[in-house]
Design a protein with these regions (language model features):
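Short, positively charged
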Residues: 1-98, 103-294
């Protein structure tokens, strides 16, 4: 949930939800103390909650109240004293998907929050080698740059005045898919297939995409709250990676997990050269509970 002067609506709602849940936890449980970092994040994100209308605030109150009373109170040990921390976006770069961490000397509850979506994460393409424990790869970096250079050259030929991706799409519907998404997906798919040589690399890729540490994913949907248990997941030893469409990559792990990565622009402006994957997963052995709001 990254802060920006031009933060998308989905991000502001996500920050407001994280703020609301932390406030509810703090008020409901006497054995929890916020860390200095959490206090600072709460202070920053209060404005997003305050910007909600009364109906939205009421919905958040219902969701957070149900999470605390019907789930979290069963996970916390009443005799423990916990700290509540809010983790920065930088943790996700290294595979920790935790947004809220409740920690005691002998217990820990990691929570990943999602508001009206179930994406696992949104990784950028510049760090692909690091996904499989390769610190740097000059050839990958060069190939990535060449794809962008070629795309920008073709875009300038198509329209020398276009500054937005949508302007290119308006002229030629499949232009971005054919000249940017497809070659980038091919690059990533081929690179991972050719460079994953050990089971430890498969495990690193899995942990990066799904989560490095045990956690619970809480998805706040309009009619219910879905809580998924990502505790003690079996680690995979093998993975099959394939490009399934111009903007899609599929990862099939031998522990029953299938990940689908959809490539899309992270900014509307061509000059930012910013793209990222939206990662969704299918899991065979994930326990989950659904808490109805009505």
């Amino acid at each position: 949930m990254k802060e920006s002067d031009f933060m998308p609506v989905s991000n502001t709602l996500g920050r407001a939800f994280e703020y609301a849940l932390c406030q509810k936890i703090d008020s409901k449980f006497d054995n929890i103390t916020l860390t200095d970092r959490a206090v600072a994040e709460q202070s920053k994100d209060k404005r997003y909650y305050d910007a909600l209308n009364s109906d939205e605030k009421s919905k958040y109150d219902i969701s957070t109240n149900r999470i605390c009373s019907e789930w979290l109170n069963l996970k916390l040990i009443s005799s423990n004293m916990y700290t509540l921390d809010r983790l920065p976006d930088s943790a996700g770069v290294n595979g920790d998907v935790t947004d809220i961490r409740l920690e005691a000397p002998n217990a820990i509850v990691n929570i990943s929050l999602k508001h009206n979506h179930n994406a696992l994460k949104h990784p950028r393409l510049t760090r692909v080698p690091k996904w499989i424990d390769i610190n740097t790869d000059s050839k990958y970096a060069s190939d990535y740059k060449n794809i962008w250079d070629s795309f920008l050259s073709k875009a300038n030929t198509l329209s020398s005045t276009a500054t937005l991706f949508n302007e290119l799409i308006a002229i030629e519907a499949n232009f971005v898919f054919d000249n940017l998404y497809n070659p980038l997906c091919k690059l990533v798919s081929n690179y991972l297939t050719e460079n994953i040589k050990t089971s430890s690399q498969v495990e690193s890729l899995f942990k990066f995409m799904v989560g490095k540490y045990d956690f619970y994913k809480i998805i706040d949907n309009p009619d219910c709250v879905l809580i998924q248990d990502f505790i003690d997941l079996k680690m995979p030893k093998n993975v099959k990676i394939e490009q399934t469409d111009k903007s899609y990559i599929k990862m099939t792990f031998n522990n029953g997990v299938i990940l689908n990565l959809r490539l899309h622009t992270a900014s509307s402006r061509i000059s930012t050269k910013s793209v990222k994957f939206d990662v969704r997963g299918s899991f065979d052995d994930i326990d989950s509970i659904t808490i109805k709001k009505n």
